[in-house]
Amino acid sequence: HAMSRRQRQMCIRDRYKVLSPFSEVKETLNKLKKKDFKLAILSNGTPSLLGNLVKNNNLENIFDDIFSIEEVGIFKPDSKVYELPVNKYNIKKDEILFLSANTWDVSGGGNYGFNSVWVNRNKNIFDNLDYQPLDEIHDLSELLEII
C-alpha cells in the first residue's frame, strides 16, 4: 500500500517524538550543568516538539531555555534566530559556544558571531562554506576537553 503525502508527514512527525539522545549526551550535559554553564536549545523545531523531546528524555532539569524559530517566524540560518539567546540574556555573541551537527548551522552561528563547534559524529568533510568551525568534536563528551 502506498502512503499518502499526509501519512508520510505524520509518520515522520511521530518518529521525531521518540528521538533519543546519543549515549554520552545526558552525562556530558549534566557535567556542564554542574560547572554552571547555561544550556539551551536553539532549533528550527516547534516549541511543542522540542518540549516533548526534552520531557520524554528526562532532560527538563538540564536545559535553561528552549529557543524556537517560531519566536521570530523565520528559519536558521537567518540571524534573527541566533539573536534570541543574545537578546534574552543580554550577553555578547562571542560569549556563546554554539554546537551543531549541521555544517550550515555551524556556519550560520559562526557568521553571526558565536564560537561555533561542529559535532561531526560521522567524520565527514566540512562543507565549503564561508565559515570554518572553532573546533570539531566527534561526540559531545569531547566538548569537556575543549572548554
Regions flagged by a language model, labelled:
Residues 1-12:
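Single conserved hydrophobic/aromatic residue that forms the stacking wall/gate
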Residues 30, 42, 46-47, 51-147:
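Asp-based, Mg2+/Mn2+-dependent phosphohydrolase catalytic module
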Residues 11, 34, 145-147:
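Short, Lys/Arg-enriched, disordered terminal segments
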Residues 2-4, 26, 33, 90:
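Short, flexible hinge/linker loops that cap or flank conserved catalytic cores
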Residues 13-41, 51, 79:
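Short, acidic loop-to-helix structural element flanking the phosphoryl-transfer center
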